[in-house]
């Protein structure tokens, strides 16, 4: 008979852990949270320090009964939910049901933590059990209470003022505001015309290359009309050019840190076109365990909710062995790369990485679904690249001018040649390409020329214009452009904006983005978010009634206070009160503001068509 009971959230996680442990252990799953606030009422005692009134979640009574029964049969209980706020809250609620506080002194109920589901990590955790971190429990409780207060009371107000079935959220409403604000910016935007002029030049050596007009009379080329563009074309057409200056420099491109949650969601959106929700679902599957042939259920990546880029020494050495063997010592830095941890990140956490660097994507491809494989490959490549040397590029900038114009017109071209690929041999970070909402300051803003291959050139060398089809004049092309409105958010851009403004936390981004779509406040059109009519109506009402609640700085400050609860520097009740006081004031304000339901059409003398 088992002497120890291990409790986790997920049946998949339970199966993977069972594989690594002997008969002395029994593993059970709580299948998520076992207790929560009631669905039928507020469930928070506003008069008694916001005391939450937890109840057993529907369908979980039998789960708890089974856990309690099994706990009576063993000597020790190990609570092993995920290593984050939600996991700590699950552990705490189960510990209470087992009549223990999760402290070592209870002699029976312990908390164990591991960031990866591997044999070594699990056995290491069981050898050094700890106690429930009440700071994490209180941080989760504070967030849950705040979200319930706003969701319950705020949504009731929306039902009264706008229409039934609507919801309000402490963070979701701010996310909707960002999308509505961006749409207003786009509607107010007025496009500006600008022109570019490109010369196709050739010297003594092939190939011919393009150069853009960079400056006129020493000032940035700012061509606002077609007439002005034609004046410049007339001044330079048919003239030979001369190379005025050549600037060469070596440039290093450093590797990027291994994934944290927000970066994984952004990159998966850019490169794989996954929604944050899909990314986190797949990552959870890879974390909890996939059947890998004879190995059985195997945890393939570390815990996927993290804001720390830290890598354990063991994992670092693991990566360095792979780099040395598969790429060569020239790709291996003399000392491991170390990445800075953000201010509020939990040092106990690690970055999202493979549990074994030796388990490359191709070696397990046959066991993974296509989406699982694509995400695992993204994580593996990023992790390996993070421990490689920088890429080295030779960057060349060439300025040339038409002969006889006294250097009045300077045309510039820039080319980059990769001298040593370094980490880019494995991984290149994606970008969020945005169309310009103003005139580019120079040609490199207007167009990326980094991959341009330049011929061998020397200062003073004569160049000539090369005629091609579809050119405005032989060797010259003028193009009309218009500045574009600020882009609508896609998943990657919205996550970046939420992160930069401190709204929500990486572990909540996926649910925020899913919720605002499920509520029909925003919709996706061609991969970009647009506010719906409902979203605009709700946002307009909330902006009038809840100016603080929808203020990004207020929301960010609230997140910082909740982080302080997690760090143990602020009582959770104090953090909730700091939010609740202005919330009550704004609720009173909003009650007096007319919503769509309050607006009644004035009576007319026209007969009713139905009467």
Regions found by a protein language model. Name each.
Residues 2-5, 16, 25, 155, ...:
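Basic, low-complexity terminal or inter-domain segments flanking catalytic cores
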Residues 55-78, 178-179, 267-268, 375-384, ...:
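Phosphate-interacting basic helix/loop segments used at nucleotide- and nucleic-acid interfaces
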Residues 82, 254-256, 260, 265-279:
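A conserved hydrophobic secondary-structure block that centers on an alpha-helix together
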Residues 1-144, 214-215, 224-230, 335, ...:
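Intrinsically disordered, low-complexity regulatory segments
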Residues 222-257, 469:
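Metal- or metallocofactor-binding catalytic centers and their adjacent structured scaffolds
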Residues 11-14, 31-37, 83-87, 115-120, ...:
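Conserved nucleotide-binding/hydrolysis micro-motifs of P-loop NTPases
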Residues 72, 117-201, 245-252:
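C-terminal or mid-to-C-terminal helical accessory/interaction module adjacent to the motor/catalytic core
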């Amino acid at each position: 008979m088992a002497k120890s009971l291990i409790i986790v959230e997920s049946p998949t996680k339970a199966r993977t852990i069972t594989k690594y442990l002997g008969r002395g252990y029994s593993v059970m799953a709580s299948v998520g949270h076992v207790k929560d606030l009631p669905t039928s009422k507020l469930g928070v005692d506003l008069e008694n320090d916001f005391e939450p009134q937890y109840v057993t979640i529907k369908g979980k009574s039998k789960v708890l009964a089974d856990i309690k029964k099994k706990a009576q049969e063993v000597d020790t209980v190990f609570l092993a939910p995920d290593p984050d706020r939600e996991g700590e809250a699950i552990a705490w609620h189960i510990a209470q049901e087992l009549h223990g506080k999760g402290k070592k002194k209870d002699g029976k109920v312990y908390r164990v933590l591991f960031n990866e589901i591997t044999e070594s990590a699990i056995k290491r955790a069981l050898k050094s059990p700890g106690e429930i971190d009440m700071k994490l429990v209180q941080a989760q409780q504070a967030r849950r209470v705040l979200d319930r207060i706003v969701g319950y009371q705020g949504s009731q107000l929306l039902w009264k003022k706008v229409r039934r079935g609507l919801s309000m959220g402490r963070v979701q409403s701010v996310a909707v505001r960002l999308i509505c604000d961006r749409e207003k910016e786009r509607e107010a935007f007025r496009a500006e015309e600008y022109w570019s002029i490109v010369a196709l030049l050739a010297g003594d050596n092939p190939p011919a290359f393009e150069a853009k007009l960079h400056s006129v009379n020493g000032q940035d080329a700012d061509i606002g009309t077609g007439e002005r563009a034609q004046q410049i074309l007339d001044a330079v057409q048919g003239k030979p050019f001369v190379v005025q200056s050549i600037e060469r420099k070596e440039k290093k491109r450093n590797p990027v840190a291994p994934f944290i949650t927000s970066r994984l969601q952004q990159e998966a959106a850019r490169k794989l076109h996954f929604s944050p929700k899909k990314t986190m679902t797949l990552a959870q599957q890879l974390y909890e365990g996939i059947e890998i042939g004879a190995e059985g259920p195997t945890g393939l990546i570390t815990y996927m909710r993290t804001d720390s880029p830290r890598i354990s020494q063991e994992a670092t050495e693991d990566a360095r062995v792979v780099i040395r063997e598969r790429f060569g010592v020239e790709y291996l830095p003399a000392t491991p790369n170390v990445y800075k941890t953000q201010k509020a990140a939990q040092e106990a956490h690690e970055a999202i990485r493979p549990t074994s660097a030796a388990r490359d994507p191709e070696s397990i491809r046959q066991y993974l679904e296509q989406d699982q494989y694509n995400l695992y490959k993204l994580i593996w490549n990023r992790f390996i690249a993070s421990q490689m040397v920088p890429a080295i590029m030779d960057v060349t900038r060439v300025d040339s001018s038409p002969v006889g114009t006294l250097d009045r017109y300077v045309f510039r071209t820039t080319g980059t040649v990769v001298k040593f690929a370094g980490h880019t041999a494995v991984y290149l970070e994606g970008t969020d390409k945005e169309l310009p909402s103003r005139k580019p300051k120079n040609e490199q803003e207007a167009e990326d020329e980094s991959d341009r291959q330049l011929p061998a050139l020397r200062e003073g060398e004569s160049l000539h214009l090369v005629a091609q089809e579809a050119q405005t004049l032989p060797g010259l092309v003028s193009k009309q452009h218009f500045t574009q409105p600020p882009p609508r958010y896609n998943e990657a851009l919205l996550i970046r904006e939420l992160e930069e403004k401190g709204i929500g936390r990486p572990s909540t981004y996926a649910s925020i983005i899913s919720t605002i779509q499920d509520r029909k406040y925003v919709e996706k059109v061609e991969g970009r978010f647009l506010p719906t009519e409902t979203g605009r109506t709700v946002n307009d009402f909330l902006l009038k009634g809840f100016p603080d609640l929808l203020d990004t700085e207020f929301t960010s400050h609230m997140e910082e206070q909740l982080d302080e609860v997690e760090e143990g520097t602020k009582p959770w009740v104090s953090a909730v009160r700091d939010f609740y006081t202005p919330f009550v004031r704004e609720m009173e304000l909003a009650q007096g503001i007319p919503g769509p339901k309050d607006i009644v059409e004035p009576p007319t003398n026209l007969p009713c068509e139905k009467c």
